[in-house]
């Protein structure tokens, strides 16, 4: 049985109902990734990314004396994923917990809401994290909100974040992003 948002088997077979968003190959769309670290709020965490042929490497160090997070985010997108149930990530982790972040047109007090869902990684092993849209929690600057629920028809951005209340180095390789 697959538990949503946790590593599952290493199969690369895809059914007809999956949608490849990127696999970081030269023919894959450039999602315009950029870094947002906790230094935007006085923190000391550091993180960066490097795209290679067939993967994106996100690495750095978190420091909980401040914001305690590092993230990468895509440029603004317009995705209708309403025919799908969630996001599937192919990752090689370090045993730490990561957060997948989606944004939509939803607003709270006039500001953009982001939606977070955590997933676990296996140290040094490739795994697949399947995260159903129903697991994404609305947040504003980390504060959990009562609503609105994520509307997969209006995805405007995505990102990867480490925010697990641990100090120290992190490294995650991301091979593909699918909607399933």
Placement of each model-derived feature along the sequence:
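Beta-rich carbohydrate-recognition modules and glycan-binding surfaces
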Residues: 2-180
């Amino acid at each position: 049985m697959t538990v949503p948002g946790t590593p599952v088997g290493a199969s690369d077979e895809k059914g007809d109902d999956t949608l490849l968003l990127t696999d970081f190959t030269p023919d894959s769309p450039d999602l315009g990734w950029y870094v947002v670290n906790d230094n935007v709020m006085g923190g000391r965490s550091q993180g960066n990314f490097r795209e290679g042929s067939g993967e994106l490497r996100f690495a750095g160090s978190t420091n909980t004396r401040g914001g305690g997070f590092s993230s990468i985010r895509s440029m603004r997108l317009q995705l209708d994923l309403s025919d799908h149930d969630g996001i599937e990530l192919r990752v090689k982790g370090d045993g730490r917990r990561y957060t997948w972040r989606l944004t939509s047109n939803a607003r709270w007090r006039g500001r953009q809401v982001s939606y977070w869902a955590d997933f676990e990684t296996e140290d040094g092993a490739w795994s697949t994290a399947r995260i159903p849209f129903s697991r994404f929690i609305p947040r504003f600057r980390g504060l959990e909100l009562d609503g609105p629920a994520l509307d997969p028809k209006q995805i405007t951005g995505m990102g990867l974040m480490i925010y697990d209340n641990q100090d120290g180095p992190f490294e995650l390789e991301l091979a593909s992003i699918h909607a399933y």
